[in-house]
Amino acid sequence: MEFFSFLSDHYSHANLVDRALQLLKERIRRGDAMAYFLRGQLYFEEGWYEEALEQFEEIKEKDHQATYQLGVMYYDGLGTTPDAEKGVEYMKKIVDSPCPKARHLQFAAAYNLGRAYYEGKGVKRSEEDAERLWLFAADNGNPKASVKAQSILGLYYSTKEPKELEKAFYWHSEACGNGNLESQGALGLMYFYGQGIRQDTEAALHCLREAAERGNVYAQGNLVEYYYKMKFFTKCVAFSKRIADYDEVHDIPMIAKVTDCLPEFINRGMAMASFYHARCLQLGLGITKDEATAKQYYSKACRLNPALADELHSLVIRQRI
């Protein structure tokens, strides 16, 4: 029955897409300019990138949304050979456009352009230009601006040298208030360690638990560490196993897509959970001692994040965990 249900769902979706394309074709025939972009966007959403690229190229001089999508597609190599310089060129067109119709796209374009400058991809690397563009995109915490830019400013100010932790806390607070899951977990850690704000364990746990419930794997990994250090071993074992058993190949990209969290932090959360689960198994804390299985989880932690595993191992040697 499940197979037939799958077929039914598949064909009903295919029929809906076909019907939508027919309607858009009719709207185009009647001279509806917006229908060209909508057809390209439908191709894009369905993963028909070559058709989407062709459609957007056709209307790029008249439609700012098409220009923006072309920037994304050339930068990421969707439907074409990756061409970061061309992607950057299209994003700059949106950011620099004086046309009111481009205004709603400028925050997202500035965020993407900031990433390009920060990574030095398609343009000469410049942290100053990246910061300038992100500040524009963040628009003083405006919820209708780029919340991603607000969050990445929090990350930027907490990792640059010298660190500017009060600015980092401010931007993570703005992003969290606008619903950003990555920043909610980051706020929890800043409260926990008193970074950029007075230490507040209660506020930290509130942020971390809520972020963990919403799917932030890095927050989950840090809660595992907290449960271990507080000697809540039964809770630590159950929680850490669930996270450690994520599949590193398939689950990390999927979780990143669903939660909009950065893969590097998902990886770090999984590595933390794997290490502490291994430690509990090795010592028989909250679970029957099993050194063979412990080795498997230690290996997974090392595979996921060698630097973090080495850091945690040094704490074991110093009898800190």
Functional labels for PLM-detected ranges:
Residues 104-112, 145-153, 225-228, 253-273, ...:
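TPR/TPR-like alpha-solenoid helical repeat scaffolds
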Residues 92-94, 132, 137-138, 231-249, ...:
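TPR/TPR-like (Sel1-like) alpha-helical repeat modules
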